[in-house]
From Swiss-Prot:
Protein's name in the database: Cytochrome c oxidase assembly factor 5
Keyword Transit peptide applies: no
GO CC term (a single one): mitochondrion
GO BP field: leukocyte differentiation; mitochondrial cytochrome c oxidase assembly; multicellular organism growth; spleen development; thymus development
Disease: Mitochondrial complex IV deficiency, nuclear type 9: An autosomal recessive, infantile disorder with a fatal course in the first weeks of life, and characterized by hypertrophic cardiomyopathy and mitochondrial complex IV deficiency. Postmortem microscopic investigations show accumulation of lipid droplets in cardiomyocytes and mitochondrial proliferation.
Length: 74
């Protein structure tokens, strides 16, 4: 599922997860067929696994213990 490419510049912490979450939302049936905004679809429960992974990645940036272990995600 990850769409990480080596030729892309590294945008920052959790950039790959953020990009994949946006792509997942834009390709979901909620946005394509129903015409809702990605924010509404995210609240309705689409792409939950990527949403959780992005949350954990952002949380690990602030967690001092996780700073030594490395960020979760890609």
């Amino acid at each position: 599922m990850p769409k990480y490419y080596e030729d892309k510049p590294q945008g920052g912490a959790c950039a790959g997860l953020k990009e994949d979450l946006g792509a997942c939302l834009l390709q979901s049936d909620c946005v394509v067929q129903e015409g809702k905004s990605p924010r509404q679809c995210l609240k309705e429960g689409y792409c939950n696994s990527l949403k959780y992974a992005f949350f954990e990645c952002k949380r690990s940036v602030l967690d001092n213990r996780a700073r030594f272990r490395g960020r979760k995600g890609y």
